[in-house]
Amino acid sequence: MNIERLTTLQPVWDRYDTQIHNQKDNDNEVPVHQVSYTNLAEMVGEMNKLLEPSQVHLKFELHDKLNEYYVKVIEDSTNEVIREIPPKRWLDFYAAMTEFLGLFVDEKK
């Protein structure tokens, strides 16, 4: 039996790297659906009905700077916000960072 010495691992590494990239590309594919406001309102109503026994409801709010929605989970008895998804603080931070970066990058419209 003749076993040749492998001088480099580059061909093996290239094949591994290609497989990993192909797998990542397939994992990132998420179908995007367009949802109208009426459909969204209907879905929120159904979720609130589902949450009635737990005494909380959902409220969708539009972030003023990012123009993206986030969800507030609100306790019915006290009207207190229990949780925000994603947290509004994070969205504020992201908006501030994009505004800061926008000062350095000339945006063409």
From Swiss-Prot:
Record's protein name: Uncharacterized protein YvyC
Signal peptide: none
SUPFAM superfamilies, per the entry: FlaG-like
Top-rank taxon: Bacteria
Any matching Pfam family: FlaG
InterPro entries per record: FlaG, FlaG-like_sf
Family matches, as NCBIfam families: PRK07738.1 (NF005834)
